[in-house]
C-alpha cells in the first residue's frame, strides 16, 4: 500500500513544475556562489582554493535558499489536493489519509536529500574542472557526507513548517516564506555558541560536520531534530483528524 502511494505521489510530482523550480534554484545557488568566488582576497580569488566552492555553496544554500525550496515542495505535495479541490474525489477512493500524508512526507524527505546531492554534484564538477589535482579523496568524501547529512537534517528541521502550513490551509507558498525567515535566522544563531547548539538549522551543521562540534553538541543536535520530527507528526495527526 505504502509503495503504491509513493509511486502515485512521485508521478504527480513528475507532472508538476515544482521540481523544475527546485532544480533551477539549486543551479542558481551554484552560479551565485561561483560569481562570489571571483572576488579576491590578498590578490587571490576565493574560487582558486581547492574545496572553497563546495564549502561556500553548502552554507549559502542552507542559510538562504534550499530550506525554503524544500518546505515549498513538501507543503505543495500535502496541500495540493486541498488547493486544487480534488480532496473530495480522493475520499471516494478507500485511501488511508494518514498513510497518504506520510507517503508525501517520505517523498519530500527523499527529494530534500536529492536536492543537496544535486548541489554537491554541481560543485564537485566545477572543483574538478578548476583544480582536479588539488582535490583529495578525503576532501571529496567529507563534503559528500556533509551534503548528505545536510539534506537529511534540513528536512527534519523544517518539517514542522511543512506540517503547520498544511494544517493552516492558507496556501503552500507560505511555507517558502516561513522557511526563508527560519533559515536566515540561523545566521544570527550561529553567532552564539549556545544558540548554535540548540537552533535547529545550525544544529544540522553540528551533526553534518560543517561546524567543529564535540560529541555533546552533536547529540544535542540529534535530540533537537527528533523533537522537530515529533512536533511535525503531531501537527499532521491533527490535520488528518480535522479532515475526517
Model region roles, listed by residue range:
Residues 77-109:
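Helix-loop-helix units of permease transmembrane domains in multi-pass membrane transporters
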Residues 9, 13, 91, 159-170, ...:
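Generic transmembrane alpha-helix motif of multi-pass integral membrane proteins
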Residues 1-26, 170:
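Aromatic- and glycine-rich beta-strand/loop motifs that create alpha-glucan
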Residues 70-74, 122, 160-161, 200, ...:
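Hydrophobic/aromatic residues in alpha-helical transmembrane segments
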Residues 35-54, 172, 176-244:
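Terminal transmembrane helical anchor/hairpin motif
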Residues 17-40, 58-73, 114, 175-186, ...:
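Hydrophobic alpha-helical transmembrane segments of multi-pass membrane transport/permease proteins
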Residues 28-66, 70, 102-168, 208-212:
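Secretory targeting signals
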Residues 17-19, 96-98, 102, 139, ...:
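Membrane-helix interface segments
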Amino acid at each position: 500500500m505504502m509503495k503504491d502511494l509513493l509511486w502515485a505521489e512521485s508521478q504527480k510530482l513528475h507532472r508538476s513544475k515544482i521540481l523544475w523550480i527546485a532544480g533551477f534554484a539549486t543551479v542558481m545557488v551554484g552560479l551565485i556562489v561561483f560569481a562570489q568566488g571571483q572576488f579576491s582576497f590578498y590578490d587571490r580569488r576565493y574560487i582558486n582554493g581547492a574545496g572553497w566552492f563546495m564549502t561556500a555553496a553548502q552554507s549559502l544554500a542552507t542559510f538562504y535558499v534550499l530550506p525554503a525550496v524544500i518546505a515549498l515542495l513538501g507543503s505543495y505535495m500535502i496541500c495540493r489536493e486541498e488547493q486544487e479541490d480534488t480532496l473530495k474525489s480522493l475520499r471516494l477512493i478507500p485511501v488511508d489519509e494518514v498513510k497518504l500524508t506520510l507517503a508525501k512526507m517520505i517523498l519530500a524527505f527523499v527529494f530534500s536529500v536529492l536536492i543537496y546531492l544535486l548541489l554537491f554534484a554541481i560543485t564537485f564538477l566545477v572543483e574538478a574542472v578548476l583544480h582536479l589535482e588539488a582535490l583529495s579523496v578525503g576532501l571529496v568524501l567529507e563534503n559528500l557526507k556533509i551534503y548528505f547529512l545536510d539534506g537529511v537534517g534540513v528536512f527534519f528541521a523544517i518539517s514542522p513548517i511543512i506540517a503547520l502550513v498544511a494544517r493552516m490551509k492558507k496556501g503552500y507558498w507560505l511555507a517558502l516564506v516561513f522557511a526563508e525567515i527560519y533559515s536566515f535566522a540561523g545566521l544570527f544563531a550561529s553567532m552564539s555558541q549556545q544558540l548554535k547548539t540548540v537552533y535547529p538549522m545550525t544544529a544540522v551543521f553540528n551533526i553534518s560536520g560543517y561546524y567543529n562540534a564535540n560529541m555533546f553538541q552533536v547529540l544535542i543536535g540529534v535530540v533537537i531534530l527528533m523533537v522537530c520530527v515529533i512536533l511535525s507528526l503531531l501537527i499532521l495527526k491533527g490535520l488528518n483528524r480535522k479532515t475526517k
